[in-house]
């Protein structure tokens, strides 16, 4: 696990999730799907009140690099027993720089 921060912008404003996390395996399709798992995390913003959401823009901060998030649909789910949260972003518009940390 490493430091990971995702900032998402939608009609409710800016929301973030940050903490220890890592990318999860995702299908190799285009535009890409980004999947992440967080432990020891903190959320801010109204987006986390809904399990499904639309994103206008955003960014991923991982490993000292930043990656833009384009228009996308997202979901999140929380596992209270395991104390982690999973976030999936299904990009609608291809980004200029693809986050290629999925493994």
Curated annotation (Swiss-Prot):
It is found in: Cell surface. GO terms for biological process: cell-cell adhesion; culmination involved in sorocarp development; DNA damage response. GO terms for cellular component: cell surface; extracellular matrix. It holds the Pfam family Dicty_CAD. O-glycosylated. Its main location: other. Keywords: Cell adhesion, Glycoprotein. Belongs to the csb family. Cell-cell adhesion during early development. This is Glycoprotein 24B. It comes from Dictyostelium discoideum (Social amoeba).
